[in-house]
C-alpha cells in the first residue's frame, strides 16, 4: 500500500452525499460533475424512478435465484426482447455487468478460438477476459487498420477480433465496417464493446458479429447485455459460466 501511495497509484472513493442533475455534493460542497457516465441524465429522471417503483412493487427487489433455476422473470424476458428489437438482432442475453458479460463471452468461446486480437485501448474487462482464458494477449495499434492487418497475417485457425466502439478516454470511434471486413476474410469473428456508445449513437452491428453493451451509462440503470444470432446466444446460456452461475 505504501508503494502505491508513493507512486501516486493509490485508489480512493469519494462519498457522494447528494446528486442533483449535473451537480454532486461532497463534504457539504456542491460541485459540477464532469466524470459521470450518465450521459442522458436518465439515472435521476422522474419517469425512470417511477418505473422502478412500479417494478419493485410488482416483482420485488431480487430475483431469488439464478436465471437457469427460477430467477428469470417476465421482466427480464421483455427487456431482452426489447433490446433484441432495438439492436436488430435475433436474440439478447442479459448480464449483471459489462465486465461479467465480456468475461462470459470469452469463457464460452475458450475452446473454439486459436487467437484473439484486441485494440490497444480496449477496456480492462476485455484484457482481463483474454488473460483468464489463457490465450496470448495480442494488441494492434489503436484504431489502426493497417496494424490489425499485419497482426492478422501472422495468425492461423479460428480468431476473434475485439474492439471498443466508442473509446471512453478520448471519445473516438472504431472503424467497425473495416474491422468486420477483415474478420470475414480471415476466419475470424468480430466483437464490439459498445458500453459508451449504446443509447448515444445508432448501433452498427454487422451480421455474424458479437455486440455487448451496458445499461449503466446512457440508459441510466444497471446491467449489460449481449446480442447476436439466436444460436450464439443459446450457446452462451449453455457455456458461459459467469451467466450460468451468477
State each model region's role.
Residues 6-59, 157, 188:
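N-terminal "arm"/small-domain region of PLP-dependent enzymes with the aminotransferase-like
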Residues 42-43, 200-203, 224-230:
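Short beta-strand-to-turn element immediately C-terminal to the catalytic PLP-Schiff-base lysine
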Residues 50-98:
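Conserved N-terminal alpha-helix of the aminotransferase class I/II PLP-enzyme fold
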Residues 97, 117-133:
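Substrate-binding/gating loop at the entrance of the active-site cleft, primarily
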Residues 105-124, 145:
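Conserved PLP-anchoring active-site segment centered on the Schiff-base-forming lysine
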Residues 138, 142-192:
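Active-site phosphate-binding strand-loop segment of PLP-dependent enzymes
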Residues 212, 219-246:
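Conserved core segment of the aminotransferase class I/II
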Amino acid at each position: 500500500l505504501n508503494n502505491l501511495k508513493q507512486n501516486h497509484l493509490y485508489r480512493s472513493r469519494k462519498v457522494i452525499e447528494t446528486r442533483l442533475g449535473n451537480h454532486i455534493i461532497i463534504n457539504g460542497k456542491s460541485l459540477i460533475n464532469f466524470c459521470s457516465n450518465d450521459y442522458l441524465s436518465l439515472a435521476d429522471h422522474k419517469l425512470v424512478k417511477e418505473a422502478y417503483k412500479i417494478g419493485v412493487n410488482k416483482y420485488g427487489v431480487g430475483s431469488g435465484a439464478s436465471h437457469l433455476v427460477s430467477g428469470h422473470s417476465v421482466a427480464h424476458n421483455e427487456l431482452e426482447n426489447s433490446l433484441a428489437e432495438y439492436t436488430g438482432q435475433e436474440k439478447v442475453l442479459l448480464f449483471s455487468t459489462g465486465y461479467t458479460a465480456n468475461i462470459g463471452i470469452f469463457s464460452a468461446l475458450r475452446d473454439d478460438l486459436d487467437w484473439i486480437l484486441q485494440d490497444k485501448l480496449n477496456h480492462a474487462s476485455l484484457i482481463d477476459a483474454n488473460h483468464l482464458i489463457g490465450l496470448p494477449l495480442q494488441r494492434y495499434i489503436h484504431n489502426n487498420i493497417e496494424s490489425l492487418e499485419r497482426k492478422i497475417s501472422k495468425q492461423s485457425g479460428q480468431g476473434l477480433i475485439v474492439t471498443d466502439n466508442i473509446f471512453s478516454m478520448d471519445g473516438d470511434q472504431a472503424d467497425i465496417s473495416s474491422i468486420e471486413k477483415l474478420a470475414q476474410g480471415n476466419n475470424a469473428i468480430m466483437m464490439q464493446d459498445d458500453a459508451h456508445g449504446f443509447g448515444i449513437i445508432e448501433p452498427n452491428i454487422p451480421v455474424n458479429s458479437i455486440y455487448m453493451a451496458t445499461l449503466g451509462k446512457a440508459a441510466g440503470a444497471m446491467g449489460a447485455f449481449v446480442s447476436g444470432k439466436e444460436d450464439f446466444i443459446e450457446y452462451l446460456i449453455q457455456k458461459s459460466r459467469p451467466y450460468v452461475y451468477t
